[in-house]
């Protein structure tokens, strides 16, 4: 089952990359177009939304000041840190996607993020990035689903200590 899931995710990713490369050749996407598409994609975790809807860095900027500015060592370092942050963010995308059924199960069993932290045996000293990623993904899932009208009045959605 996991193998078929991984194959399905891989095929979907390859198709998405092919479509993205074709659309880049056909028309250049502006920041406004990318931002307006946010209503069309409904993903569960906020991290996935950010990851899927990034604006291109080479988007045209109308200000002349930005065209005349030469890159300095500080700006170069800032670009590198953004790239490393993006790659670190994308590293756990598969982990968060594969844990969606787990998030659903925890939420259906009325578990708060504090309960999930105990379930994962996650303490302040725990360094395990996978467990931390799963926990932060559930916190986002929990906040999103507790904001729905039908879940607002649930007791476990009123928990603030996590």
Swiss-Prot record:
Look up keyword Cell wall biogenesis/degradation and say if it applies: no
Biased composition, class Basic and acidic residues, residue ranges: 65-79
The residues the entry assigns to the signal sequence are: 1-20
What cellular component GO annotations does this protein have?
extracellular region; host cell cytoplasm; host cell nucleus
Q: Tell whether Secreted is among the UniProt keywords.
A: yes
Keywords on record: Host cytoplasm, Host nucleus, Secreted, Signal, Virulence
Q: Where is this region: Disordered?
A: 55-93
Q: Which domain of life is it from?
A: Eukaryota
What does the induction field say?
A: Expression is induced during host plant infection.
Q: Where in the cell is it found?
A: Secreted; Host cytoplasm; Host nucleus
Q: Where is this motif: RxLR-dEER?
A: 51-91
Q: Which family does the similarity line name? A: Belongs to the RxLR effector family.
Protein task: Effector that enhances P.infestans colonization of Nicotiana benthamiana leaves.
Instruction: Quote the entry's note on domains.
Output: The RxLR-dEER motif acts to carry the protein into the host cell cytoplasm through binding to cell surface phosphatidylinositol-3-phosphate.
Q: What is this protein called?
A: RxLR effector protein PexRD50
Taxonomic placement: Eukaryota, Sar, Stramenopiles, Oomycota, Peronosporales
């Amino acid at each position: 089952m996991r193998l078929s899931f991984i194959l399905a995710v891989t095929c979907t990713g390859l198709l998405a990359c092919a479509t993205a490369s074709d659309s880049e050749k056909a028309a250049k996407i502006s920041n406004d177009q990318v931002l307006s598409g946010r209503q069309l994609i409904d993903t569960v975790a906020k991290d996935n939304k950010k990851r899927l809807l990034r604006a291109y860095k080479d988007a045209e900027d109308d200000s002349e000041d930005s065209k005349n500015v030469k890159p300095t060592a500080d700006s170069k370092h800032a670009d590198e840190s953004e790239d490393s942050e993006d790659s670190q963010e994308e590293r756990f995308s598969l982990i968060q996607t594969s844990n969606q059924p787990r998030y659903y199960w925890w939420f259906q069993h009325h578990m708060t993020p504090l309960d999930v932290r105990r379930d994962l045996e996650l303490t302040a000293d725990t360094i395990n990035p996978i467990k931390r990623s799963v926990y932060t993904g559930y916190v986002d899932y929990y906040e999103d689903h507790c904001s729905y009208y039908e879940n607002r009045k649930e007791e476990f959605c009123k928990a603030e200590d996590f």
